[in-house]
Every structure is written in structure tokens, then in C-alpha cells.
Amino acid sequence: MDIILMENVDGLGQIGDLVKVKPGYARNFLIPQKFAVEANTRNIKELEHQKRQLEHKAQKVLQASEVVKAQIEKVTCEFALRAGDDGKLFGSVTSMEIQAKLAESGVEVDRKKIQLDEPIKALGEYEVAVKLPAGILATVKVAVTALD
């Protein structure tokens, strides 16, 4: 029996896959548990339509992410903070502060998407990764200088 998977099923396939299984397995387990639907012409056409819509939506998200990436990479976040003689900061620069600087520049990013393993605690220039939708990774330049 041919079925269309509605959920990821270990050993069978991913969502949207058209697979052949034994009729009893489909009727007694997969279909009642809403893991699959029978692969008739109506369901196949509906699946193809949904795939086209998802591809279109994914393309829009990709284009929007590319625009945001270009905006992020133009920005340099500059921080002037008090520092000791050895170049260590009194305090630190966190993802929340980087998000605030990006927002000042007109780029809205969720602070959880800023890939900063630990806060910046020393003077210097850093490149910080920002994870965007559609798997796009942008880098923002962060410059930390001493406050006179």
C-alpha cells in the first residue's frame, strides 16, 4: 500500500515522503496515529501543492535573511568601556548589548541568535556570528576600546 508520511517515522522516511508499506501496518498503525495518509490522487496533488507553497515561503525567508545579512555586515558595533592597564574590561560586552547596538543601526535581531560563547572581557576587535533564518550566518564586527 502506498502512503504519504505526515510525520517523520524512523525506518520509513521524512514528512512528505511517498512510501510503500504493508496494508496492515498502514491501516492499523500509521493512518490511525495520523503518521500517514493513503496515497490517492487527491492527497498526492494536495501534497505537491503544499510543497510548492513551502518552497515559495522558504524562498521569501531566504531573500529576507540575505537582506538582513547585508545590513548586519555593514555595521560595526563600537563600545568604549573602562579598562585596566592590562587591557581587561571592568565589566563585559554581552549579546544583549550587541543587540542594542544593532537595533540603534536599524537592524532587529533576537539576542539569542547572536553566537557569543562568553561575554567579551578584553579590548580589541572581534567578529561575532549571528544566526539568521534559512541557515544563513552573518558576522558583525565588534570593536571594544578603552574609555579615556
UniProtKB/Swiss-Prot annotation:
Gene3D superfamilies in alphabetical order: Ribosomal protein L9, C-terminal domain, Ribosomal protein L9, N-terminal domain
Signal peptide segment: none
Matching InterPro entries: Ribosomal_bL9 (IPR000244), Ribosomal_bL9/RNase_H1_N (IPR009027), Ribosomal_bL9_bac/chp (IPR020594), Ribosomal_bL9_C (IPR020069), Ribosomal_bL9_C_sf (IPR036791), Ribosomal_bL9_N (IPR020070), Ribosomal_bL9_N_sf (IPR036935)
GO cellular component: ribonucleoprotein complex; ribosome
The entry's keywords: Ribonucleoprotein, Ribosomal protein, RNA-binding, rRNA-binding
This protein's record includes keyword Endoplasmic reticulum: no
Entry protein name: Large ribosomal subunit protein bL9
